[in-house]
Amino acid sequence: SDFGDFLRSAGNTAPEDEPDLNKIHFNMDIFRAFAKGYIESAKSFLTPLEIEMLPYAVMLFPYMQAVRFLADYINGDTYYQIKYAEHNYVRTLAQYKLYQEARRAVPEMKEYISLLL
């Protein structure tokens, strides 16, 4: 989970509440650098299945965060601190866009991980 959550933040080319969705992309260079170091350190205790699932963790975390922001927005913004009325809604859209970008990158992430093993 640390792997996916780190890349939700570091792999995003924009802030998590970026209103301009065209600025949101998944940075594969950050993924490659982080995955290389992570797998080199963790492959001794991760199972092959856990390593295989790492790209899905990258995709899952922005999706989960989008759901959390949306739930908070619907429930009256009681959990996450907001700066303006639609802040959690904007965050929802931004995180969902990052999810879509990460989802498109899954084949490339899987290919890169296979080269590290």
Segments from the language model and where they lie:
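ATP/Mg2+ or Mg2+-diphosphate-binding catalytic cores
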Residues: 64-117
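General structural signal for secondary-structure boundaries
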Residues: 27, 47-48, 110, 117
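All-alpha amphipathic helical-bundle segments outside canonical DNA-binding/catalytic cores
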Residues: 46-58
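Active-site activation/catalytic loop segments of kinase-like enzymes and analogous catalytic loops
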Residues: 1-44, 60-79
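Sparse, context-dependent recognition of short Cys/His-centered cofactor- or disulfide-binding micro-motifs
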Residues: 39, 55, 84-87
